[in-house]
Amino acid sequence: MTTLFIVGTDTEVGKTVVTSALAAYWQTYHSSESLGVIKLLQTGIGDVEHYQRLLPHVEVVNPLRYETPVAPPVAAEKENRSIPLDQVWQGLNDLQQRKNLVLAEGLGGLGSPVTWELTVADLAGEWGLPTVLVVPVKLGAIAQTVANVALARQYKVNLKGIIFSCPRPLSHEEIVNFAPITLIESLTKTPVLGMISYLENIEDITKLAHIASSLDLEMLF
């Protein structure tokens, strides 16, 4: 059984695209091996519904959800609810017992709050989850990557590598300038597993699988 925790430097950076691409690849090239997708916590509507449409024959789990689309501690306070992380852990553990691969998507960024005391980095480190960091290709990507890798090290996260994701159409020159792989690997001492180009339709499973096949997947599976 393999578990990958997909985290980002921030919200809306491509975590769902990367998770979808990895799921599409597994469904296409490892169809005989079971797959589970879990959104550990969700606020508002979005990711879970996307996975259910994209992967109708895959078990998609969301152990904890709030209606208000803000950070979980704020959402829980607004809805007069608690944040039972044991429920989240149990949902993940149950899925791990039954699947060959579990793709777990985080929320927000690595430093985003999960409770009033804990961040996504705390969960990744304390739960020992092999983690992939998704970084958007834009001006400032180098600093974001360095800062988040440092945060991962501080919390003893098992960081397997970095995947860059293009949030909009970019030229080759822009990609090279915004996310110079050699420089980033030198600064972070962490492998860059590849680049996810901009996709207008993130529910095209064939394109998603093709894009994922260009990543250095031997580092993950």
Curated annotation (Swiss-Prot):
GO BP annotations listed: biotin biosynthetic process
EC number(s) per entry: 6.3.3.3
Molecular functions per Gene Ontology: ATP binding; dethiobiotin synthase activity; magnesium ion binding
EC class: ligase
Cofactor dependence: Mg(2+)
Pathway this chain belongs to: Cofactor biosynthesis; biotin biosynthesis; biotin from 7,8-diaminononanoate: step 1/2
Organism superkingdom: Bacteria
Locations listed in the record: Cytoplasm
One cellular component (GO) term of this entry: cytosol
Keyword Acetylation assigned: no
A Pfam short name: AAA_26
Catalytic reaction equation(s): (7R,8S)-7,8-diammoniononanoate + CO2 + ATP = (4R,5S)-dethiobiotin + ADP + phosphate + 3 H(+); (7R,8S)-8-amino-7-(carboxyamino)nonanoate + ATP = (4R,5S)-dethiobiotin + ADP + phosphate + H(+)
Binding site for Mg(2+): 16, 47, 105
Active site: 39
Entry similarity comment: Belongs to the dethiobiotin synthetase family.
Name of the protein described by the UniProt record: ATP-dependent dethiobiotin synthetase BioD
Protein source organism: Crocosphaera subtropica (strain ATCC 51142 / BH68) (Cyanothece sp. (strain ATCC 51142))
Name of encoding gene: bioD
